[in-house]
A protein has these predicted regions:
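Generic hydrophobic secondary-structure signal
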Residues: 5-7, 37-42, 94, 98
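N-terminal secretory signal peptides
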Residues: 18-68
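Compact alpha-helical subdomains of small soluble proteins
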Residues: 20, 52-144
Length: 144
């Protein structure tokens, strides 16, 4: 009896649960919270890159013939793409650009980090790359 009740409650919660999109979450935040979120992404990216470089240096310090592989360079490029150089410390500009991105219905399912990457590339005037990432994200996260 209890198993049936648990199953019915579980099934009911699955059917009646609302799906929150990344755009809904972003719109529910106040501007201070949006700025804090973006600062957190920037800080975690910088810390991740720093610690990764330290670990690579520790592991390959003694090997004189070691050359940094391309995938490590690409990893650092992806982390750098999350941060807009032109916007500098004006994180509110990035938050407003994310607001504009999420105002389009086609972009509501794009995860926040991908949206931040697209917006940062656009702010750095790499519009071709930003448009390509936007089209790929719209295709990957279609809204029905």
């Amino acid at each position: 009896m209890i198993k049936r009740l648990i199953f019915i409650v579980f099934l009911f919660s699955l059917l009646m649960g609302q799906k929150r999109t990344p755009a809904m979450y972003w719109e529910s935040l106040e501007m201070k919270e949006k700025v804090s979120f973006i600062n957190g992404v920037y800080a975690s990216g910088a810390k991740l890159k720093y610690h990764h470089k330290q670990e690579v240096k520790k592991q390959y310090n003694q090997d004189l013939s070691w050359v940094e592989p391309y995938y490590i360079e690409r990893f650092y490029e992806i982390i750098d793409e999350l941060r807009s150089k032109n916007a500098g410390y004006d994180v509110e500009l990035i938050a407003k650009a994310l607001d504009a991105l999420y105002s389009n219905y086609d972009n509501t399912e794009i995860p926040l980090l991908e949206a931040l990457r697209i917006v940062s590339l656009a702010q750095d005037e790499k519009t071709d790359k930003a448009d390509l990432y936007l089209l790929k994200a719209q295709k990957r996260y279609k809204t029905y």
